[in-house]
Amino acid sequence: MVDAPAPAKSPNLEIQDFRGNFDEVSELIQSSWAENAQKPLLYSPEFLASCFEYPGASFRLAPTIYTGNKPVAFIAGFPRTVRYRGRDLRIIVASFLSVSVGQKNKGYGVLLWNELVGRARAAGYDGMVNYCVDGEAMNGIILGCCRMLKLATARFYSTPYQMRLLTQKRASEAHSGRKEEREQDALENFLEGVRPIVDETPLARVWSREEAAWQLKRYGSIVAQHSAGSRRGIVTGYLMEIANAQRTRCLLIEDLLWGTLAAPERETLLHQFLDRGISAGAQMAIVPVLNYADLAPLRAARFRSSPRLVHGYLTIFSGEPLPEEVPAAYLDIF
């Protein structure tokens, strides 16, 4: 087993559990990522706080380097269960790795990533997933760290994206039934919709009821469901701003759960979802193409290829089952 590196010994610099100071970490992420070639999303304090409300999330899995009371480097791992090669694995998805501009090139990012690996292994996790935008230096850094720690790692999927601009219009929505009934119906619809995806997709996220409930109510959540007789489906996503001068409001599509809907009904569901996003102020929509869902409704809705490409790296701490490339995946990217 690879031991996590010891915390830094300087009295002014040490690795600690994240303290929950979301305002400062939000500023750290934005300033650190501002140098990236592609404009990042604006990870607000409220969005970050909602990520840690996910069942099982812990400040322990968010090692942070503080100088006094100020965070200068940060990373977080969020728990997920995935079914891969017939086994349910508990993994973490590593995200938000950031180092303050004045502290870069000192090895803090590698130090924190290694620390997160050690903490995840000590907590009994089976592996981890890292995402890197195509062309960014992090691709080489992640693979280099995995080789250094002798971790079985493979690029399991490279995710292209599709997007479309959204035209502001008045969208009429009719809601029948009480709010509590709609929420319960959405939860059952969601869990029913993911079941065949988990069975048919080589690497797929497995949801508990509590996790699915979080997904439907997460910060900025947009959800639409549609039924036609006994057929039904649901689409989920959330609203974020892009960290550009215009603060473009972007609707990120997460779960395309067409369920048992027929082709025209899937298009209806997608239009309902986009209308809800427009009503919430969305100016564009973007969706990762993971090949677990029918893409015909996206083509009908005039989605087009985006230049964005994100590589996913799967690490299995024990080496079994061996991580390898898959033709389709169902797992969130952030």
Regions found by a protein language model. Name each.
Residues E46, A76-V82, A94-V99, C132-E136, ...:
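An acidic- and aromatic-residue-enriched active-site/binding cleft used to recognize and process polar
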Residues L61-A62, N69, F74, I91, ...:
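Beta-sheet entry/capping signal
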Residues G102-D134, M138-L143:
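Membrane-interface helix-loop-helix junctions at boundaries between adjacent transmembrane segments
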